[in-house]
């Protein structure tokens, strides 16, 4: 629905997500850019690998005139009450969001941020922009797995963990069983829904 509603003609897709069951969907797009990784199949016919896509580009950066009120991104709502709706966001929106968040939680160049949030939602995309703006390192999670999140905190000495309250409840229950080192964390950021007081404590 979203692809048709937004009139998308170019798809940037991780190779691992290409399966026989969804090959027909991917082949609907005029242009396909494939990010090579583990897994995946070769059903797409025409397409270009991401590295090749970058090599084909010109070395000089194109001239870009900033206009903070022109829409840059269309993010779709979750569609819990009706069909998802495309929300047009511009540079001013993203700037205000990142400024407001960084006033409370500074993301610095030495920080390592666990990114287990979906990047196609506003919460995840804003957190990613804040981290990049502050020069922090993003530790991307391919899928939601509580054990994987706790394991990555210890493995990469993560300092910032942004999640939704529901996910925190899973992690707290798992953490109570022992065996996970989260001592490197400086901030746990909660968003997308109200955080219950009991969970906070």
Regions found by a protein language model. Give the residues of each.
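Conserved pre-ATP/AMP-binding loop-to-beta segment of ANL
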Residues: 51-76, 83, 106-112
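Structural core segment of the AMP-binding/adenylate-forming
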Residues: 1-52
């Amino acid at each position: 629905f979203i692809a048709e509603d937004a009139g998308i003609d170019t798809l940037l897709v991780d190779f691992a997500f290409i399966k026989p069951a969804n090959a027909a969907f991917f082949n609907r797009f005029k242009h396909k850019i494939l990010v090579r990784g583990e897994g995946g199949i070769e059903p797409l016919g025409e397409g270009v690998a991401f590295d090749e896509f970058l090599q084909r580009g010109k070395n000089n950066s194109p001239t870009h005139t900033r206009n903070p009120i022109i829409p840059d991104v269309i993010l779709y709502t979750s569609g819990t009450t009706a069909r998802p709706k495309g929300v047009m966001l511009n540079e001013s929106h993203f700037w205000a969001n990142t400024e407001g968040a960084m006033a409370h939680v500074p993301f610095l160049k030495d920080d390592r941020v666990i990114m287990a949030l979906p990047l196609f939602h506003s919460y995840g995309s804003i957190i990613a922009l804040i981290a990049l703006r502050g020069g922090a390192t993003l530790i991307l999670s391919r899928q939601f797995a509580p054990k994987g999140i706790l394991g990555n905190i210890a493995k990469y000495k993560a300092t910032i963990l942004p999640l939704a309250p529901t996910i925190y409840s899973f992690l707290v229950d798992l953490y109570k069983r022992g065996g996970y080192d989260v001592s490197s964390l400086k901030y746990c950021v909660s968003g997308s829904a109200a955080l219950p007081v009991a969970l906070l404590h």
